[in-house]
Regions:
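N-terminal glycine-rich anion-binding loop in soluble enzyme alpha/beta folds
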Residues: 1-64, 130-133, 139-141
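Short coil/turn connectors at secondary-structure junctions
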Residues: 11-14, 38-39, 99-100, 120-124
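Short, well-structured alpha-helical segments in soluble
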Residues: 61-77
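N-terminal active-site wall of soluble small-molecule enzyme domains
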Residues: 64, 68-69, 87-94, 98
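Gly/Ser/Thr-rich loops at beta-strand to alpha-helix junctions
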Residues: 80-91, 104-110, 129-133
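Short, acidic/small-residue loops that bind anionic groups at enzyme active sites
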Residues: 94-118
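Conserved beta-alpha
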Residues: 109-141
Length: 141
């Protein structure tokens, strides 16, 4: 016999995805296309967090909006959170502290691990929309 516990508004979507405000096509395979995932996900678009603002100008001033959106996803029922923008690595610690669920804010979090397993003299390659604004802080957050 299975006993069901309550406490969530929504069940069955364990992963929440914080999304930048954008209008470009999200084809299958893109994090922002629900058909990419072999399981249900829940999306939350963060108001005023455009790619231009986050990537080119920097995310300063958007931290509270991302925390609020992440907390809303948790209240709704997700058990973990990720984002659709690697530049959000800068918010990793703040999001993880504020949410109470696992948070993976950026695929850039994997760079130190990948570098550690490479042979000496080899380097990790990173594809980015803006090399000019990708800083060492993004890679060590």
């Amino acid at each position: 016999m299975t006993i069901a516990k309550g406490g969530k508004n929504v069940y069955g979507a364990a992963v929440g995805i914080l999304m930048l405000e954008s209008r470009f096509p999200r084809i299958p395979g893109d994090v922002g296309n629900a058909t990419t995932w072999p399981f249900p996900v829940m999306f939350k678009v963060v108001p005023s967090a455009s790619p231009e603002r986050v990537v080119l100008q920097g995310p300063d001033g958007l931290q509270s909006a991302f925390i609020e959106a992440a907390q809303e996803l948790v209240r709704t029922g997700v058990d973990g959170i990720t984002t659709n923008c690697g530049f959000l690595a800068l918010f990793q610690d703040d999001l993880a502290s504020a949410c109470g669920v696992p948070v993976a804010s950026s695929s850039l979090m994997q760079v130190p691990w990948v570098q550690a397993i490479l042979a000496p003299g080899k380097r990790v390659g990173v594809l980015t929309v803006s090399a000019a604004t990708l800083t060492p802080a993004h890679l060590t957050a």
